[in-house]
Amino acid sequence: KDPSKAAAIGTMLQAGGMVSSASDNLVFPYSTDPGNQNPKYELIELVGGTQILFFASNYMLKPMQERNDPRIPCYFEPGADGVYRGLGNREPAETDDKDNMLSSVVSSYLFRKDAPELIYSCQEQLLLEAEAYARGLGVAQNLSKANELYKKGVREACAFYGVAENDIDTYVTGLPELTTVTPENALYEIHMQQWIDLMDRPFE
């Protein structure tokens, strides 16, 4: 949003040397040892050990469903009937006539004891670089380069959550080719993947 930063962005892109693989991820580790467990796990333990505090938002779940995103079961639990259902803002959770939960909660996988806290990642870097090339920020606009970085970023994002390689291949193959859409739509797809990737991150 600050045009004066474009040149600096271009210089960094040309220089390289930034986060370039999962081994470079900035991660705060937790373990299964008491006193060193993920605070999200400890929060759920404080309220009885059942995760019914945090639900799937339709603003996240629906775009993932539209794209057949393989991260859905990593992010959310299905309802008691096996269906993934998100909630709108201020919408109450849905149950069946036996009080079984039908609305999807955030997955126990994300609330496990030793779930690491991801601070900055390879996929975040790749998607930011894809955005820069799609917008022409400090570099010539290049949707082919943006597409390459976008696909790599999505692969890394899925792999971080343990999605099987075959499922990643299927998903990435089905994503739009950014070279075949308008620059505006290319940016939309990049931003959507950034949004999905940051689901389990704090607002800051």
Spans of model-derived segments:
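Hydrophobic-face positions in mid-chain alpha helices that act as interaction patches
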Residues: 5-129, 134-135, 141-197, 203
